[in-house]
């Protein structure tokens, strides 16, 4: 399975000119923990996450309506491409303690947002299938069994 297939096809993103309040509303409306922040051509400029809300907004008493998202977004941002494997993405996310990883094309245009949850669900599904196959093999009463 390709990395893009693990992403929500309707990625949550807003332009760098948007406000922090816009980003928070988008996360709440879409039930996601991160939004991609893109420039006028759709290229990833940063990522804004729940952690950014807690670490950069909540304790500073800044007005979310008046604060541009570009001031609080995480940048530079680690990116995955369509050629990144799920295993490589998982390794990056675990090593860097990321819960979200933007997936981009060769022009850095945002295609999807990969979440650690999506990766782990896929991995657990693969392991369950492997376990079922092994169980069937062991319990199969064939020749020599």
Predicted regions and their residues:
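Short, charge-rich amphipathic segments
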Residues: 18-29, 62-72, 107-108
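Short, flexible active-site loop motifs that bind/organize anionic cofactors or intermediates
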Residues: 10-13, 43-44, 79, 109
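Tandem CBS (Bateman) regulatory domains
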Residues: 1-10, 49-94, 116-145
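A glycine-centered beta-loop-beta connector
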Residues: 27-30, 35-51, 93, 101-119
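The conserved cystathionine-beta-synthase
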Residues: 13-31, 38, 79-97, 104
């Amino acid at each position: 399975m390709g990395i893009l297939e693990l992403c929500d096809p309707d990625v949550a993103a807003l332009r760098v000119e948007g406000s922090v309040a816009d980003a928070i509303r988008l996360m709440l409306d879409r039930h996601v923990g991160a939004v991609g922040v893109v420039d006028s051509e759709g290229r990833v400029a940063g990522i804004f996450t729940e952690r950014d809300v807690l670490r950069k907004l909540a304790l500073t008493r800044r007005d979310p309506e008046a604060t541009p998202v570009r001031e609080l977004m995480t940048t530079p941002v680690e990116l995955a491409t369509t050629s990144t494997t799920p295993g490589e993405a998982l390794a990056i996310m675990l090593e860097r303690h990321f819960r979200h990883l933007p997936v981009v094309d060769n022009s850095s245009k945002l295609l999807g947002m990969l979440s650690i949850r999506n990766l782990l669900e896929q991995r657990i599904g693969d392991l369950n299938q492997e376990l079922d196959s092994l169980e069937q093999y062991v319990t199969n009463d064939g020749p020599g069994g």
